From Swiss-Prot:
Name recorded for this polypeptide: Putative zinc-binding protein YnfU
Other remarks on this protein: Encoded in the Qin prophage.
UniProt keyword list: Metal-binding, Zinc
Pfam families: YnfU
Length: 56
C-alpha cells in the first residue's frame, strides 16, 4: 500500500490581509482565508471576514 502525500501541509502558508476597521495588514493562514472564516485583527482586536473577490 502506498502512502498518500499530505497535500494540506503545502497549502498552509500565511497570506497578508488588511483589516477593514484599522487598515493595518496582518498575516493569516491561507486555508482559513480561502474558507471564508472569521479573522481577528491583532492590531485592533476586531473580528472581520475577507472578501475573496478582492484577494483573488
Amino acid at each position: 500500500m502506498s502512502e498518500r502525500k499530505n497535500s494540506k501541509s503545502r497549502r498552509n502558508y500565511l497570506v497578508k490581509c488588511s483589516c477593514p476597521n484599522c487598515t493595518q495588514e496582518s498575516e493569516h493562514s491561507f486555508s482559513r482565508v480561502q474558507k471564508g472564516a472569521l479573522l481577528i485583527c491583532p492590531h485592533c482586536n476586531k473580528v472581520f471576514q475577507t472578501n475573496l473577490k478582492a484577494v483573488a
